[in-house]
A protein has these predicted regions:
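S-adenosylmethionine
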Residues: 1-469
Length: 469
C-alpha cells in the first residue's frame, strides 16, 4: 500500500523514497567518487544509470547530486552525461528490444552490469550520431574489463558490433516499442484518447523538454528579469499566455546564475503556473496549500497577493517543509509560512478558514513522462488505483477548511481519468455544497491540458466554489 502522500518534486508523488533522496537537498549517492583528473564520463553515466535502474533511485535526484559534485567538468561533459543517462532511461524498452534481436542471451537474463552497459551503448549507437560506433564498442569493452567482466568483453563487443552494422534494419511495429512505453500505459491512453491522439501524446513526451520560469513579481518586473538574464548570457523567450513567464536556454546550470540565487525567478512548468492563476487570489485572502512541496504554486500565490493576506503551505515531512521554507526565504515572501502536516489528518483549527484551498495532490505523474522519464517504469495500474483512492481521502479530509463562497482548486500532473474527472464527479456527489465554477474553463469548471499543448506538461485543474452552507 502506498502511504507516502507527499509530493516528491518529480511529480510521481506516490513513490516511497529513501529519506536521503529528498529533492532540494544533496542526496547520498552510491555513485563512486572519481578523481578530478581521471573522470570517465561514460563510466560515471553508467554508474548513475545502474543506481537509477537497479536500485530504484530517482533519476533527477541522482543526476543533480552527481552534476553538483562534478561542477568542474566542462559544460560539454556534463551535457554528454545528462543526455546519456536521460536518453537511456527514456528509450530503455526499445533498447532492450534491439539487444534481444541480436543477442542469444536475453536482456532479462544478463548480469545487471552487462545489460545496463549494453543499453547505454546501444543508445549511443542509435541516437548519438556524433559518437563513432567504433568508439562506443571499444569503450564498452574497456568498461567491462575494468569492472571485472573480462570474460564477457567478447560477448559485449560482438553484440554491439552486430547491432552497429544492422541498426537501421530494426523495425518497431508497436507503440510500446516505438515510444518505449509500458504496454499498460499504451492501452490506457488508447482507451482514453484513441490511437491517433495517444500517439501524439507519446510523441510529445519525446520532444525536447524546455525550462520555463516565472518572474518573482515581488522583486522585479518581467522586463527587468529578461534584461538581467540576457546580461548573464541566457537566451530568453516570452510565453504568450503568461506575461510573467519565459522559456530559458543557453546556460550551464541554474545555481550558476546570480539571478536564480537572488530569487528573481522560479523554475516551473507553464501548466503548473495556471494553478495560481486559476485560484485568482484577492487582496487579503487566507490560502492553505495542503501538499505544497517544493512550494512553486504556493509561492506564486503569495506573490500574487502582493504582500497581503497569508499562505499556509503544508507537507508531510520536515525535509519537504525545509524545501518550502528555502523557497520562501529565497523569494523574500513575508506573507507565507510552512508547517508539517499530514493531509489525511483532519485539522479542526483550519475548518472554515480558507478563502482558497489548494489541493495539488499526489498523483501518478502520467502527464509528465517526458520530463520525468523513469516514472513509466515505477508506476503500475494498481498504484494508480491506490493514488486515486488517496486523492479522495485527502479531499474528503480537507474540504472542510474552505469558507462558504470560498474556492477549492484540485490539480494533478496526470492525464488519467480515474485521478481527474472521476474524482471530480465523486467529490461533487459526496459534497454537494461544492459546485464546479461555471466561469472557469468555458463553463466546464475543469481543464485537461495534454502534453505538448502550449509547450507544457500534461496537467489537470478543477475549480470548485463552496456555494452552500
Amino acid at each position: 500500500m502506498i502511504n507516502n502522500h507527499s509530493k516528491n518534486n518529480h511529480n510521481n508523488k506516490n513513490s516511497q523514497i529513501n529519506k536521503n533522496n529528498i529533492p532540494g537537498r544533496p542526496a547520498k549517492s552510491n555513485v563512486t567518487a572519481h578523481n578530478e583528473h581521471s573522470v570517465d564520463t561514460r563510466e560515471l553515466a553508467l554508474e548513475m544509470f545502474i543506481e537509477i535502474n537497479e536500485r530504484g533511485a530517482f533519476s533527477h535526484i541522482v543526476l543533480r547530486s552527481v552534476l553538483d559534485k562534478y561542477q568542474y567538468l566542462s559544460k560539454q561533459d556534463r551535457a554528454f552525461m545528462t543526455r546519456l543517462v536521460d536518453g537511456t532511461i527514456e528509450y530503455m524498452l526499445q533498447l532492450d528490444y534491439i539487444i534481444d534481436s541480436f543477442s542469444k542471451t536475453k536482456v532479462r537474463k544478463m548480469k545487471p552490469f552487462i545489460r545496463n552497459l549494453l543499453r547505454m551503448s546501444v543508445y549511443q549507437i542509435k541516437y548519438m550520431d556524433a559518437v563513432p560506433d567504433s568508439a562506443v564498442c571499444n569503450e564498452a569493452v574497456k568498461l567491462a574489463k575494468r569492472h571485472k567482466f573480462a570474460q564477457l568483453s567478447g560477448f559485449v563487443n560482438g553484440v554491439l558490433r552486430n547491432i552497429a552494422r544492422n541498426i537501421d534494419s530494426v523495425q518497431f511495429d508497436t507503440l510500446s516499442i516505438r515510444y518505449s512505453m509500458p504496454q499498460w500505459i499504451v492501452d490506457r491512453f488508447v482507451a482514453a484518447y484513441g490511437e491517433k491522439k495517444a500517439e501524439e501524446i507519446f510523441k510529445a513526451f519525446h520532444s525536447k523538454s524546455t525550462i520555463s520560469i516565472r518572474t518573482n513579481l515581488t522583486r522585479c518586473t518581467p522586463d527587468e528579469l529578461r534584461a538581467t538574464l540576457e546580461a548573464e548570457g541566457v537566451t530568453v523567450t516570452a510565453v504568450d499566455e503568461l506575461n510573467y513567464a519565459f522559456v530559458i536556454s543557453g546556460f550551464d546550470y541554474l545555481n550558476g546564475l546570480q539571478s536564480f540565487r537572488d530569487g528573481l525567478f522560479y523554475v516551473q512548468d507553464i501548466s503548473s503556473m495556471l494553478v495560481a492563476q486559476t485560484a485568482a487570489p484577492k487582496k487579503g485572502d487566507y490560502v492553505i496549500d495542503v501538499c505544497a512541496a517544493p512550494g512553486g504554486k504556493s509561492t506564486h500565490i503569495a506573490e500574487l497577493l502582493q504582500g497581503s493576506g497569508h499562505v499556509l503551505a503544508r507537507d508531510l515531512t520536515d525535509n519537504k517543509v525545509d524545501m518550502i521554507e528555502e523557497n520562501i526565504e529565497r523569494h523574500g515572501l513575508n506573507n507565507m509560512s510552512a508547517e508539517v502536516w499530514d493531509a489525511t489528518v483532519p485539522d479542526a483549527d483550519s475548518a472554515g478558514k480558507a478563502d482558497i484551498l489548494i489541493c495539488d495532490l499526489p498523483c501518478s505523474g502520467l502527464g509528465v513522462l517526458g520530463r520525468k522519464k523513469d516514472i513509466r517504469y515505477k508506476m503500475t495500474p494498481e498504484s494508480v488505483d491506490e493514488l486515486a483512492a488517496l486523492q479522495r481521502q485527502i479531499l474528503d479530509t480537507v474540504h472542510t477548511y474552505v469558507k462558504p463562497n470560498g474556492v477549492l482548486v484540485y490539480s494533478t500532473c496526470t492525464i488519467d481519468e480515474a485521478e481527474n474527472e472521476d474524482n471530480v464527479r465523486w467529490f461533487i456527489e459526496k459534497h454537494p455544497e461544492f459546485e464546479l465554477d461555471k466561469n472557469f474553463a468555458e463553463g466546464t469548471g475543469m481543464k485537461q491540458i495534454l502534453p505538448g499543448e502550449h509547450g507544457s506538461d500534461g496537467f489537470f485543474i478543477a475549480r470548485f466554489i463552496k456555494s452552500k452552507l
